[in-house]
């Protein structure tokens, strides 16, 4: 019996004492006024969702232009009394070229394969607008 080995993706980030974030060997992002770790988590969820949609769309011969937004609620969970993200609403607006008849299928694959969303305890609620 042949066993398959899963791909492994490893990531690293550094934050200096001034709050600047750096990808080792890559670009640096200055600390943005008003941005909390909670905002960054929601931004990561939107970015990952768009990137996942783009990946699946390109595999079927489409280019993607997309934007998105997310809103989240953090409060004490009833299950364990810890503060956590208990609701995440994501809206993605995307345009495919050429247009795709199976946009709902692409959106479903994007939701499934966004590892940020898959890593959360709460299941994000998505609203896809794909044309």
Positions of the model-derived regions?
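Extended beta-strand/beta-hairpin segments
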Residues: 1-46, 50-131
